[in-house]
Structures are given as C-alpha cells and as structure tokens.
C-alpha cells in the first residue's frame, strides 16, 4: 500500500525494475504515454507500439510488435479511461516481465496475476477513496533497485515493513478491506462482478449501436467495460447535452478535452439501474425535434 496515486508508480516502476537500462512501452492512451515519458528520465523507454494514429480508438496488436528481448519489462495501461478502450490480449514475451497499470479496471473481473511481473493501480475507481496506490509485485523482481533510489520509492522498503514504514493511508486501507469483503460476500466474487459489469456495458453499447444520433468511436473489439465514450453530431451539441443531462441528475458526463464528447464511467459502484436510467435519458434526448434538426444540418454540411 502506497501513499499517493498510480502516477507515482510511473517513476517507481523504472526506478525498481529497469535493470537493463531500457524498457518497452505500449502507448494506448494518455496515461500510458505519461508513464513512458516519466520512465524516459531513468533510461530508454522505447515506445514499441501506439494507437495515436487513430486517436487511441483501438489497442495495438500485441502479437505484431517487435519487442526488445533485452528490455527490463513491457509496460501497458490495461484500460484507458479517457478513450474508452481495454486490452483483450496481453503481450507475453519469455523472460520479459509484463507491468500493467490497472487503475481503472482492477476488481472489475478476475485477473490471472501469474501473467504479470507487476500490477499497480490507484484505488479511486473500484477500490477505495483517492489517496492510495497498491502494487502486486513478483518476488524475483524485488531487491534489484540501485542504492541511490530514494527510500520511499523502493518497493522493498514498504514490503519489509508491511506497508508501515511511515504512517500509512489508514482510511484508504480500511475502506479497501470493506470493499474486498463486499465483493466476496455480497457479490459472490469477481466472476460475478464481471458478469454484472458486462451486462451494464452491453445495455449502453447496444443502445449506441442501435441509433444514429450518438456515436461511439472505439473499435468494437476493444471497447471498455468501465468507460463508454460517445459523441453527438457536433461539439456544440455535446456541450448542450451535458448541461441538460446535469439538470436531469446525470453528472460528470463531459468527455476529456483530448476526445471531447461524453464519457459514461460505469465502475463497480454504478448499479445497473443507473445505466438503464442513462439510456432512457439518451432516448428521450435523441427523440427531441431539435436533436434531429441538428443531425440533419450536420449531415448536410458533411456532404457539401
């Protein structure tokens, strides 16, 4: 358990694991790009693949990448909150550990930890209040950090003291315990949580695919279960939609400035009823005469 969020892990990962002086990074969105930029301060952070060419609306084919067999690790961000994408396959290179930022998808479904050298995540999406990060690290990767690595940036420091080298983020740890018990005792485990989350996402994606007013830009295969992005025909309509949605009780739907449009984050805590209510609102908004007027005008301009 670490104070701070996953952004601190962007530095801790290379400080602890970049023993060969280089690592491979797959950039599938904003946070994986930031992680690569931070790692470049400590060695060669090679971007071996990126989906920037299509504004991160897909995940690079992990089986078609030329990995460096001398890389200390391969780094990915497994779910991309801003762009609404998620990995469906994992890079697996013999002798090269996989490091994954799972901040926005941890505990949403089962994870085979044996495929990873390190999993880290900020807790604020599915685990606990903001202010803490958690790392799961394979034993053989520990203890190789240089002596110059700051004490609190060394994984072994906290591991040796059961995460209590200094005063730990007690409230976040306590809340994590409650959430884990809830997932096990009330939900019935991560297999059931996955079914619930996939059902929620299916409701929203099925609606988006069944009409013409709103549009989801992500390639179907890589659509995120946690973050559903969509746009209306024009940016001015996006702004108007978000304002009316807020008045109706649907808050924080505005998409990130890098993407625009809207984003519905449907993490574990969002009940199915919330997604159904959002779809009902989308249907009513889409059916407004003014919406169709804007849609037709946009189509006319597009074909001029």
Where are the predicted features?
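Conserved PLP-binding active-site segment of the aspartate aminotransferase-like
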Residues: 226-234, 250-280
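Conserved small/polar residues in nucleotide/adenosyl-binding loops
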Residues: 293-300
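General beta-strand structural signal in soluble alpha/beta enzymes
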Residues: 1-3, 25, 47-49, 76, ...
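Active-site phosphate-binding strand-loop segment of PLP-dependent enzymes
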Residues: 39, 50-106
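Conserved PLP-binding catalytic core of the aspartate aminotransferase-like
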Residues: 214-245
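Active-site C-terminal subdomain of aminotransferase-like
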Residues: 118, 123-205, 219
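Conserved beta-loop-alpha segment that forms the PLP phosphate-binding cup at the N-terminus of a helix
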Residues: 1-24, 32-35
């Amino acid at each position: 358990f670490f104070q701070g969020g996953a952004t601190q892990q962007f530095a801790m990962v290379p400080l602890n694991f970049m023993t060969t002086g280089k690592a491979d990074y797959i950039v599938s969105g904003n946070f994986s790009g930031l992680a690569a930029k931070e790692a470049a301060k400590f060695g060669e952070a090679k971007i071996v693949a990126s989906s920037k060419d299509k504004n991160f609306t897909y995940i690079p084919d992990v089986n078609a990448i030329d990995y460096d067999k001398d890389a200390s690790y391969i780094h990915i961000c497994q779910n991309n909150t801003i762009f609404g994408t998620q990995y469906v396959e994992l890079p697996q290179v013999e002798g090269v550990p996989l490091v994954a930022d799972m901040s926005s998808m941890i505990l949403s479904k089962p994870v085979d930890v044996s495929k990873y050298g390190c999993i880290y995540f900020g807790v604020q999406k599915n685990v606990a209040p903001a202010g803490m990060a958690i790392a799961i690290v394979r034993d053989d990767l520990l203890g190789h950090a240089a002596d110059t690595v700051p004490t609190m940036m060394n994984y072994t420091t906290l591991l040796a003291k059961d995460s209590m080298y200094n005063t730990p983020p007690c409230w976040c740890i306590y809340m994590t315990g409650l959430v884990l018990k809830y997932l096990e005792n009330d939900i019935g485990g991560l297999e059931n949580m996955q079914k619930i989350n996939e059902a929620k996402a299916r409701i929203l994606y099925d609606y988006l695919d069944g009409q013409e007013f709103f549009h989801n830009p992500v390639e179907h295969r890589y659509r995120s279960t946690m973050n559903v992005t969509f746009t209306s025909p024009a940016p001015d309509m996006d702004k108007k939609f978000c304002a009316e949605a807020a008045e109706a009780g649907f808050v924080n739907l505005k998409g990130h400035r890098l993407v625009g449009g809207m984003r519905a984050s449907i993490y574990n805590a969002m009940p199915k009823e919330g997604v159904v209510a959002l779809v009902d609102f989308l249907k009513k908004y889409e059916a407004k005469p003014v919406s169709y007027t804007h849609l037709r005008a946009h189509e006319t301009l597009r074909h001029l």
